Design a protein with these regions (language model features):
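PAS-family sensory/regulatory domains
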Residues: 45-65
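Short loop/turn microsegments at loop-to-beta-strand junctions
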Residues: 16-17, 82-83, 100
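Short loop/turn elements at sensory-signaling interfaces that couple input to output
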Residues: 99-114
């Protein structure tokens, strides 16, 4: 099982799309290399931070409303379909990114997975 876990980590680090996981409170717990390329933050800078790190201030209330609803229902409104949205780069520059969201159910709690480009 440990070997499969290591393989999964290597795959996530090498895919071309940004992959970000956040726990139930919105704290970033997984940040791959493509996330660094897209948003400018290293994994060390992003891990442990709120996902607000990459969400423009004017979109945060809507984000948290959708996030809380998804965590309560165990499913996202878009059901994994990609959507075009705004995000923030480390430099402060606003980006248009295509994102999709999924709830990943674990043994004890669920996490939110973002995939973006």
């Amino acid at each position: 099982m440990e070997e499969q876990s290591k393989l999964a980590e290597r795959i996530l680090d090498q895919v071309a799309d940004a992959v970000i996981c956040a726990n139930h409170s919105g704290t970033i717990i997984r940040w791959n290399h493509a996330s660094t390329a897209l948003f400018g933050y290293s994994a060390e800078e992003a891990l442990g931070q709120s996902v607000e790190l990459i969400i423009p201030e004017h979109l945060r209330a809507a984000h948290w409303s959708g996030f809380d609803a998804a965590m309560t229902k165990g499913a996202t409104k878009l059901q994994g379909r990609p959507t075009l949205t705004r995000a923030l780069h480390k430099s402060g520059r606003r980006l248009y990114v295509e994102m999709s969201f999924a709830i990943v159910k674990g043994d004890t709690e669920s996490e939110v997975l973002w995939r973006g480009r």
